[in-house]
Amino acid sequence: MKTILRNLFYTLKRFRTASVLNLLGLSTAFAAFMLIMMKASYEYNFDTCYPDSDRLVMLNFGEEKDNSITLLPRGPIDFLIQQVPGIEYGTIYAPCWQKQAFCTNPENPQYFYETPWAVYPDFGKVIGLQFVKGSDKDMDKPESIIISESYARKLFPKGNALGSYLYTEGDNGLVKRIDKFRICGIFKDLPENCQFKNDMFIRMSDYQKDDWASQNYF
């Protein structure tokens, strides 16, 4: 072992330029390999973070070889959820059409702007959200909201997020005439390689219910 190390250091000392170039090339190749493997792992494991992910089905209109996701009307999605016997839970989801101003204290508002996603009450059951505090059982109430664990820490550093309110201004088609939302559940953060990376989910209103023409939903 000592002989090998001695020869190695002798070679490095004698052929400094070549040794440096070889080490740089090896380091670059290794870094490129790691980046490629990280990207491959990201894509291969995309949307596999959900429990029983192999049982999840997403309705989409398009060509078989087309990888795009199509916005759909609300009517046919609701019809399939209600009429197909094999569907245990179903949901639609859509981002609110504009960023909304929220605050945690209406008396001294420090506004932050977010685009919450509107979902059905069973959304958490569909993708298997893991709640660290509270639950989604109150998501059938229009003023309920669930937020991620990291977002709860950000908004409420004292740890009192559950049961607190987020106050908002403005109106939105997906959530009408609601100026405050009660946090009923805090879920474990979802990984980056999934399509549900949002930190806030609110209950979908009845807007465009039974509409078979407007294409605004997933």
Segments predicted by a language model, with ranges:
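A short amphipathic helical element positioned immediately N-terminal to and/or at the very start
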Residues: 4-15
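Short, strongly hydrophobic transmembrane alpha-helices
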Residues: 14-43
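Structural beta->alpha junctions
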Residues: 63-66, 106-110, 152, 186-190
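Mid-to-C-terminal secondary-structure elements
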Residues: 117-133, 143-218
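Membrane-proximal extracellular/periplasmic loop immediately following the first transmembrane helix
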Residues: 36-103, 110, 209, 214-218
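Glycine-centered tight turns that cap/initiate beta-strands
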Residues: 17, 85-89, 160
